[in-house]
Amino acid sequence: MPESLRRLSSLVAALSPREHGFAYFDPDAAQAQWRAQQHRVQRSQKLRRSRGYGRLSGWIIPAKDLSDVAGMPTTLGNRSRTYMATETDPFLLSCLRQGAIIPGKTLAPELGLTAYTEPVGLPHPDNPTLPGHTPGGSSGGAAVMVARGLVRAAHASDGGGSIRIPAACTGIVGYKPPHDTGNANPVAQGFLAGTLTDSAYVNNVTVPARVPRLRVGVLIEPVHAEVEVSEHMLSAVDRAASALSKAGHDVMMVRRPYGDAPFAAFHDILSLRSVKVPGEASPLVSWLRDRGSRIGEHRKEAVITEFMSVKSQVLRAWDVDVLLSPMLAFDPPPIGYFRAMSPESDFYAQTQWTPWATMFNMAGLGALVFPFENIRTPIHVGALRVSPAQLFGVAATLYGDSDRRITL
């Protein structure tokens, strides 16, 4: 067993699932993956092939428990839905082929449909940077183990902020890559990482030494809900905007880019995607499923059209290259805060907490969250007219030493 796996096993054994974030941990399977990779490398060397170790060799990358890994159980965030996977999700299979080791599955809420991580019949992970409070969701288990330093990066997915929200809650780095929004698909696969350097590496992005002068739009107005944004979140954005201005970028304030129709469409899309969920479900998932079953064909066509128009609406509204905004309207609330509400109130309260995130899922644009100055002041930068490399370059201007972990 490599030393990195031995270290991880020792750390996990000393922690509870609430602390380490694993829904399932299998060091024996991880060791078998490592041995298979070593065999492939040796075979390549014997055949004198130029490629031996993959780009992710040496990286331990746990999988989010909404995606399958052959030979491991998948719960989909509800113990009663558990099944044994016989195939591996294509994104994770790509990671394995690049040399990554997947030692287990990370805790996630039921079907990834909440911005907090409180799965049914499974432990609710605790925020290591703010004990007793949510680490966000839906990639909450992944965020916990990265923030605690168990792994450098973990697989995550983002269908409405589910990479970026946990990153913001736990003081780490989360990048939602640009993705295909065909048929109103809001979901992108990606990673959570402990540093900006690690995030760039696992996302295969080369951070430029410098970026050209860019137009940076600053948005502090909540887009998808009415909420009073905490002063420390606004102040962080203001200081970040000043830093970008001093770095030579053109910085300007922008307003909300559209009215209520896009988020109403997103709400309906989530509901429609929940219609085929079988069996008993959590109150929120049941509510979305029931709501989706009442949406007619005419409305379905209209919401898909509205969803698919968000990118053009955003680009038409803002003549800027990069968008800077808060990520959270206020600090992570206590575990159980949202779940104690009625499903409808729960959904709206989550939107008030994260009123900017979903715009980038509907637009299919890349967006990056990282702590600015300290872990209580995460900021969000989105790529409107720049490449992923340029977006990371902007972040590097604000992040400072890209290899450092930002702490309290």
Language model regions located:
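Amidase signature
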Residues: 1-51, 205-354, 362, 400-408
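Short, well-ordered beta-strand elements
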Residues: 375-393
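ATP-grasp fold ATP-binding core
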Residues: 47-70, 102-105, 323-327
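Flexible, acidic active-site loops/lids enriched in D/E/S/T/G that coordinate Mg2+ and/or position polar
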Residues: 31-56, 82-85, 114-135, 139
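A short acidic, glycine-rich active-site loop
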Residues: 80-86, 129-133, 343-355
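Short glycine/serine-rich loop segments
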Residues: 87-203, 366-378
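Enzymes and membrane/adaptor proteins characterized by extended Gly/Ser/Thr/Asp/Glu-rich
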Residues: 55-91
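Hydrophobic/aromatic ligand-binding patch that stacks against planar heteroaromatic rings
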Residues: 94, 143-145, 243, 358-361
